[in-house]
């Protein structure tokens, strides 16, 4: 029977075990926004808070990509650190920020897929949540 040869795992929705729910917006300090609220902040400079659940350094472009709260392909907020910005870091963001709750300050823009994100150019734009 064809059913016995089917792999039903292919039909399941893929989730990443690192994914988390966004922080409760009502519990954040004034002026801080969670990853779900980021979409309403497009075009504004603000501070977004979330957990780095996926992180990748691209050797080809020398860029770093961080997803907060939800991993690719279901990401709801991304942080991009391009080659020129990465030079301003004293650490490897994809290593040292992975699994941590962080704040990211900058202008929220949409990527080509409509996902909000911030391009970071300086280390000071990212802080560990506990440091705030």
Q: Across the structure, where does each feature detected by a protein language model lie?
A:
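OB-fold single-stranded nucleic acid-binding module
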Residues: 3-132
